[in-house]
């Protein structure tokens, strides 16, 4: 039986206890980001209303734990940032890491720059409106992406942005290994050193995050 639209519960997810465990002293900024997404997400086409009941667990916390794979002082590019995932949750948690949110859509880029960065006072975040192909080459220690493209296509976009010895962090699901196999023929052309499936947040989150970590030569 099909669920009618009016029968769907779009109530924003209550803050789970894991939120404070993940964010600690930074929890207030995480809460404010949550509030901004609830206020503007559907109105500006940043997230669909169906995402509100899982906004903390599937989006904010799921993204934040990827910061475990980044070192202090590094420069991170988040490509196709959209509503800020995973870049903003990571940046809130790691003020000693610099982030560039790369987003081609004007409405989303403006929201990130004029609302999120300013209202959350994220001094470690800049917003670049444009496509990945327009970003500076060999400029970033780490490049992240979430729900953008299949891994082979993603690596063609992201690897050229990454410094020698840097890494691409792609948030993926159950087909991560299949996507790695499809990407292996690109290793020589894109100067890739290795692929690794990493699970982060497993000690805190009930549904940990799967990341494909690709190291560059």
Predicted features and spans:
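Class I SAM-dependent transferase core
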Residues: 1-77, 107-125
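Residue-level signal for short amphipathic helical patches enriched in basic/charged
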Residues: 25, 47, 94-97, 146
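Residue-level signal for pocket-adjacent positions within structured domains
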Residues: 41-42, 85, 195
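Flexible, active-site-adjacent loop/turn segments at secondary-structure boundaries
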Residues: 44-45, 53-54, 83, 146-149
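Glycine-rich helix-loop-beta junction characteristic of Rossmann-like nucleotide cofactor-binding loops
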Residues: 66-72, 93, 134-137
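Conserved beta-strand/loop positions that form the S-adenosyl-L-methionine
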Residues: 79-81
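Conserved SAM-binding loop of SAM-dependent methyltransferases across substrates and taxa
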Residues: 83-96
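S-adenosylmethionine
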Residues: 96-100, 104-217
């Amino acid at each position: 039986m099909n669920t009618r639209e009016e029968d769907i519960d779009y109530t924003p997810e209550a803050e789970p206890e894991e939120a404070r465990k993940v964010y600690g002293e930074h929890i207030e900024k995480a809460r404010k980001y949550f509030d901004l997404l609830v206020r503007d997400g559907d109105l500006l086409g940043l997230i669909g209303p169906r995402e509100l009941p899982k906004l903390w667990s599937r989006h904010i916390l799921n993204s934040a734990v990827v910061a475990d794979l980044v070192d202090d002082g590094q420069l991170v590019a988040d490509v196709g940032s959209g509503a800020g995932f995973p870049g903003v949750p990571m940046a809130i948690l790691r003020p000693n890491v610099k982030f560039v949110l790369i987003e081609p859509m004007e409405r989303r880029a403006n929201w990130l720059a004029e609302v999120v960065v300013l209202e959350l006072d994220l001094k470690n975040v800049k917003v670049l409106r444009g496509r990945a192909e327009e970003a500076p080459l060999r400029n970033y220690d780490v490049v992240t992406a979430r729900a953008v493209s299949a891994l082979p296509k993603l690596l063609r976009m992201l690897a050229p942005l990454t410094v020698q010895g840097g890494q691409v962090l792609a948030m993926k699901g159950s087909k991560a290994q299949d996507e790695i196999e499809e990407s292996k023929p690109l290793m020589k052309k894109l100067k890739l050193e290795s692929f690794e499936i990493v699970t982060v947040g497993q000690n805190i989150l009930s549904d940990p995050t799967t990341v494909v970590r690709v190291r560059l030569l």
